[in-house]
Amino acid sequence: MAAAALLLLAAAAAAVVVAMALRWLLLLGGPAAGRLGKRARMPPGSTGLPLIGETLRLISAYKTPNPEPFIDERVARHGGVFTTHVFGERTVFSADPAFNRLLLAAEGRAVHSSYPSSIATLLGARSLLLTRGAAHKRLHSLTLTRLGRPASPPLLAHIDRLVLATMRQWEPAATVRLMDEAKKITFNLTVKQLVSIEPGPWTESLRREYVKLIDGFFSIPFPLAYFLPFTTYGQALKARKKVAGALREVIKKRMEEKAENGGSIGDDEGKKEKKDMVEELLQAEGGSFSEEEMVDFCLSLLVAGYETTSVLMTLAVKFLTETPAALAELKEEHANIRDMKGKNQPLEWSDYKSMPFTQCVINETLRVGNIISGVFRRANTDIHYKDYTIPKGCKIFASFRAVHLNNEHYENARTFNPWRWQINNKLQNAVGANIFTPFGGGPRLCPGYELARVVVSIFLHHLVTRFSWEETEEDRLVFFPTTRTLKGYPINLRLLSESIC
């Protein structure tokens, strides 16, 4: 899913000190070095400095608002597919949309996703992120069943209500860090979808531990960290046990309820209100999922639903604030919807489908922001592309960012321009042409991509129809270890109406 690449990039970066040292020692005399060296037609490029390769150059570039030169300079010298050496090993970078398409489609055959062991330890070996082949297909299908139907009236009602619940906590004139507030919304919504528990002391306690778990993805998991609880990674492991334990208690209770009903979930109204991912798992395949499988699966969905959607919400507001004409048009679109519905009526699917400019804003935020800058894959076999051979075992990075910000595909590509999605018919086929891949593609296409759009649309609707705002201080984007604003995007909010109902 979309968060998979986000976690991979962060964890790989965090582990760079250990990985580079170990990998370098292995490559000095090991068979991998000879195999790579004998391939005359590897994509051209540079391996940079001994031991560290070009890792520091990449990190330095991605810690700025403009990381493009790292890839642009190499594409200019070597072409759209080139070789570098980052995070401890030789890696082929692709800024070629056709090759990226092949990589995404070849998941599970010619390539597979590759993650550090620290990720597996924190998420669990049975998580959606880490499973492969038939096991991944099974979990992906279940996720799509639950998250791929955002038109469901109960789901829309939950989103609408949870967004407003967070906004009610904002005072008539408040200063908030929008990133933090967006994360509260996405966390509470994901918990609701997983286990049907409303925001309260239980969810807040879970969220506090969960934040520690997330911090572990961006830390250095050196060997002693597993045994030292005062390190960031050690604290993340401890938090993982608590989060998994809390989920396990809920799942165990639901399994007991099912057993008491003779293996049936039940059809009474109370049970219908509880319909969530846990019940999907309990009903699937005759209840064949084990308790641990369900815990790992739910934990991985909690991670996937948290970071990327909240960043998308924040960046949409930031880009709109910096583009007054776009903000004015968005406000007009949502004011018209609110006028037709009345002040306090919740949004419905027909309202969501009446937000064409909002979808343009979301597309453009995804394209310019590049919350997922790309995905790593590892070759299962020798891969032949054009005149090059990428050997089995080689790591490959498919850069979505390089394609999204290429002037050959988008006019003035580095300018936020949501109208480009209205007037340029060519872009209507952008997804099919694989020049627009914000949610990945192939078997690992994010199953919750449409739900993410719905959440952001509803959030923007209530924000622009209830508040005005201004930035309290300058905040800039950085892209390492993840896409985010440095300060969480602090803004001053002013309530437009007297109450939020």
Swiss-Prot record:
Instruction: State the protein's purpose.
Output: Catalyzes the C23-alpha-hydroxylation step in brassinosteroid biosynthesis. Converts 6-deoxocathasterone to 6-deoxoteasterone in the late C6-oxidation pathway and cathasterone to teasterone (TE) in the early C6-oxidation pathway of brassinolide (BL) biosynthesis.
Localization, UniProt: Cell membrane
Any one Gene Ontology biological process term?
brassinosteroid homeostasis
Q: Which organism is it from?
A: Oryza sativa subsp. japonica
Record has Iron as a keyword? yes
Which keywords does this Swiss-Prot/TrEMBL entry list? Brassinosteroid biosynthesis, Cell membrane, Heme, Iron, Lipid biosynthesis, Lipid metabolism, Membrane, Metal-binding, Monooxygenase, Oxidoreductase, Steroid biosynthesis, Transmembrane, Transmembrane helix
Q: Report what the protein is called.
A: Cytochrome P450 90A4
Q: Which family does it belong to?
A: Belongs to the cytochrome P450 family.
What induces it, per record?
Down-regulated by brassinolide (BL).
Topology of the protein relative to the lipid bilayer? Single-pass membrane protein
Tissues with expression = Highly expressed in shoot apex and inflorenscence. Expressed in roots, stems, leaf blades and leaf sheaths.
Read off the PANTHER family from this record: 3BETA,22ALPHA-DIHYDROXYSTEROID 3-DEHYDROGENASE, CYTOCHROME P450 26
One annotated GO molecular function is: monooxygenase activity
Q: Where are the transmembrane segments?
A: 2-22
Provide the E.C. number(s) assigned to this enzyme: 1.14.99.-
The first-level EC class reads oxidoreductase
Its gene name is: CYP90A4
**Names of required cofactors:** heme
